[in-house]
Design a protein with these regions (language model features):
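C-terminal-of-GTPase-core extension/linker across diverse P-loop GTPases
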Residues: 182-202
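TRAFAC-class small GTPase G-domain
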Residues: 1-188
Length: 202
């Protein structure tokens, strides 16, 4: 992200909905985003993550990007104040646990829910990013989920972006957050956030 300076402010917050099976790492991921602010890409977290509270939703992140300043408001399925199906997200983030194939298989159902609740009219109406969490737990052995497989699934689910990271170690967290911010910003432009030509891997 760019250094602070004179930027045009986007007044309306950009709403992001984080979906994924229970236990896939959503809460730790959101908490980790708070810890990486100001860190350089590739650096590791120096302090333990302090978990956010579900009752504090939406989780707010102030962004400076592409000479613009804007606010991300992120919700997940554990929001006790408002059921996620009643939201009107600008971007959907589909999350799974890289060490748990069941959570990867569950994304098909979540993607169907996105179409059911948020798609209006013909064609895709909302940008979707898929993110693999707990990257530090990817171990060789039976059931190993390779990046090539997850990219293929992201394409099959018609996602616009794919990224993976580890909130615990901080690996690729900055890159994943920047890509999410970029996708969110694109929803405020005439082009929108949908990717032409398929899923982009970060």
């Amino acid at each position: 992200m760019e250094t602070p300076g004179a930027r045009e402010a986007i007044e309306t917050p950009i709403t992001i909905l984080l979906l994924g099976d229970a236990g896939c790492g959503k809460s730790t991921f959101l908490s980790g985003l708070k810890c990486i602010r100001g860190q350089k890409p590739g650096s590791s977290l120096k302090e333990p993550i302090e978990l956010l509270h579900d009752t504090d939703q939406p989780f707010v992140y102030e962004i400076n990007f592409s000479k613009k300043s804007f606010t991300l408001e992120i919700y997940d399925t554990e929001n006790p104040n408002q059921h996620w199906t009643t939201l009107q997200p600008d971007v959907v983030l589909l999350a799974f646990d890289i060490s748990n194939r069941k959570t990867l298989d569950g994304l098909k159902g979540w993607r169907s829910d996105v179409i059911r609740y948020f798609q209006q009219g013909e064609g895709e109406r909302i940008p979707v990013m898929m993110v693999g969490l707990k990257r530090d737990l990817r171990k060789p052995g039976e059931g190993l989920i390779y990046p090539q497989e997850t990219y293929r699934i992201a394409q099959e689910l018609r996602c616009d972006r794919y990224a993976e990271c580890s909130a615990v170690t901080g690996e690729l967290m900055t890159q994943a957050f920047e890509d999410l911010a970029r996708l969110a910003y694109m929803t405020t432009t005439a082009e929108g956030g949908q990717t032409k030509g398929g899923c982009v891997v970060m």
